[in-house]
């Protein structure tokens, strides 16, 4: 699609007017401050006229003031939000309260004043209606979009070879779903998935990104000469308007334990733009849950909390905080990886259907548990990982974060019990995991476990927003007690076997190089020097 048809251009213009305007600039603006409110006396705040630069931000619109004579230096920066007080004054002036400043902006033309007024009104009009804003604290949203606005964080995700390559294979391997199709990329970030869609033959991709990463995505689009294919739209999917319905929605909405960050709700919300029988990549997600035994991990957290059990720390008694310290450490989910042999039973699978589940279904997720214990030991908590499937017309592709699969930047998550429970092979462990969404873009995770036929039970509530990142990069160790033969004898047997092979190779006229026989024949060089 080399250019937009008139009707499409009209719709895009409408979308721009509905969504918060971005990248607007107004030249020749005289900025005055109100010196005396009763007498309505004004004084010029800056010498000469200024240029106002407006750019979309997750919290509203950033307004930067620069001099008309020197635009390289920002004189002042303000934030226009839903709470900003503003009013029109005549045909070319606009009064606005920004931070502690009561300003009057006199524009160079009536058209500029009307456009600036629309910028302010759009912010005030849209934010109260936003589903995202209703479910998210402003401080959490600000930190979230700031985090994903860093190139280093985008690089961290892009360099996850398993993640990025699986997405590319799923999209290119199902090119029939993308060829000449309209695609929506939700939470586009750098736009890498949008580029994959274009590689698969997409006619048009709308890349929606709410963080400042949108400007970098636009740079990549322009430098790769695909601006006729990819339209980067700054904003949240809950707030923007598209000019048309789409055939496919692509996104990478998964967080730790699948649901963290509550991006899945945004992904499901985007279905309002999906045509009937449209595709979603990925199509569904499976959360796996299994009981595990890991005395080392439990002791590590327990001993950290025991710092607060000191009665003479530099002469200060800390013991009054021991209980709260213990509670805080055990409220932290552990993000790392492990040998799957620590799992004491087959995992329970909870499915999230991205094509049919509703946003509200993710506000309170109750997962019943029933485990048939395969090995006797102490259950220290529950382990979580997830798989997602891309169900395409040509092939199905899976992305897995299982401990048996190659490691990804999601790792796995473990939730500890403050009071572990001893359980025997053949017993049944039942219970429930309850994920309760909060306005910090995460979940409170409550675990309740009970050994059937006994009075033994244990529970805990954890804060998924505050995990402990334990992964060190060291190789995963097998759980204790899994060796069925002497490891020492196994090693020396291998050494003896390798030595016998090397000796045999030498006797047969060859030279062993790094354990590989017949590496080279040096006899010719020794007997026939040049």
From Swiss-Prot:
A GO molecular function held by the record: protein-arginine omega-N monomethyltransferase activity
InterPro entries according to UniProt: Arg_MeTrfase, PH-like_dom_sf, PRMT_dom, SAM-dependent_MTases_sf
Single GO cellular component term: cytosol
GO annotation terms (biological process): chromatin remodeling; peptidyl-arginine methylation, to asymmetrical-dimethyl arginine; positive regulation of ecdysone receptor signaling pathway; positive regulation of transcription by RNA polymerase II; regulation of DNA-templated transcription
Similarity field: Belongs to the class I-like SAM-binding methyltransferase superfamily. Protein arginine N-methyltransferase family.
General function of this protein: Methylates (mono- and asymmetric dimethylation) the guanidino nitrogens of arginyl residues in proteins. May methylate histone H3 at 'Arg-17' and activate transcription via chromatin remodeling.
Protein name (database record): Histone-arginine methyltransferase CARMER
């Amino acid at each position: 699609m080399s250019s937009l048809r008139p009707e499409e251009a009209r719709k895009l213009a409408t979308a721009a007017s509905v969504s918060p305007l971005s990248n607007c600039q107004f030249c020749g603006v005289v900025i005055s401050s109100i010196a005396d409110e009763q007498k309505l006396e004004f004084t010029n705040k800056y010498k000469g006229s200024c240029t106002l630069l407006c750019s979309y931000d997750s919290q509203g619109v950033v307004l930067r003031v620069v001099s008309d004579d020197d635009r390289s230096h920002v004189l002042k920066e303000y934030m226009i939000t839903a709470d900003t007080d503003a009013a029109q004054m005549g045909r070319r002036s606009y009064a606005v309260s920004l931070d502690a400043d009561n300003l009057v902006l006199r524009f160079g033309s009536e058209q500029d004043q009307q456009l600036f007024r629309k910028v302010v009104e759009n912010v005030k009009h849209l934010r109260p209606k936003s589903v995202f804003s209703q479910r998210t604290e402003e401080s959490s949203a600000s930190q979230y979009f700031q985090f994903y606005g860093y190139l280093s964080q985008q690089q961290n995700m892009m360099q996850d070879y398993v993640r990025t390559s699986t997405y590319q294979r799923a999209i290119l391997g199902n090119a029939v779903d993308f060829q000449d199709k309209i695609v929506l990329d939700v939470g586009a970030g750098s736009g890498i998935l949008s580029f994959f869609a274009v590689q698969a033959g997409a006619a048009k991709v709308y890349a929606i990104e709410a963080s400042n990463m949108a400007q970098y995505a636009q740079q990549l689009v322009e430098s790769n000469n695909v601006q006729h294919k990819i339209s980067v739209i700054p904003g949240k999917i809950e707030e923007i308007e598209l000019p048309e319905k789409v055939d496919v929605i692509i996104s990478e909405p998964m967080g730790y334990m699948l649901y963290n960050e509550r991006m899945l709700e945004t992904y499901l919300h985007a279905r309002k733009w999906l045509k009937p029988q449209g595709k979603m990549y990925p199509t569904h997600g499976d959360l796996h849950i299994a009981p595990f035994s890991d005395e080392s991990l439990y002791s590590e957290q327990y001993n950290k909390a025991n710092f607060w059990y000191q009665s003479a720390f530099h002469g200060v008694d800390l013991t009054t905080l021991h209980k709260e310290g213990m509670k805080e450490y055990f409220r932290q989910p552990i993000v790392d990886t492990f040998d799957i042999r620590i799992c004491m039973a087959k995992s329970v699978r909870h499915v999230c259907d991205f094509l049919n589940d509703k946003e509200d279904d993710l506000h309170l997720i109750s997962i019943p548990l029933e485990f048939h214990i395969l090995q006797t030991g102490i259950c220290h908590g529950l382990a979580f990982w997830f798989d997602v499937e891309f169900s395409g017309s040509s092939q199905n592709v899976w992305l897995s974060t299982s401990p048996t699969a190659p490691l990804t930047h999601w790792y796995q998550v473990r939730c500890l019990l403050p009071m572990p429970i001893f359980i025997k092979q053949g017993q049944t462990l039942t219970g429930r995991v309850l994920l309760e969404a909060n306005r910090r873009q995460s979940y409170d995770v409550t675990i309740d476990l009970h050994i059937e036929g006994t009075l033994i039970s244990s529970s805990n509530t954890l804060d998924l927003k505050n995990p402990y990142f334990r992964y060190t990069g060291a190789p995963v160790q097998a759980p204790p007690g899994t060796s069925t033969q002497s490891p020492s004898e196994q090693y020396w047997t291998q050494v003896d076997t390798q030595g016998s092979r090397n000796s045999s190779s030498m006797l047969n006229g060859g030279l062993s190089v790094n354990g590989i026989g017949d590496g080279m024949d040096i006899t010719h060089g020794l007997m026939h020097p040049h």
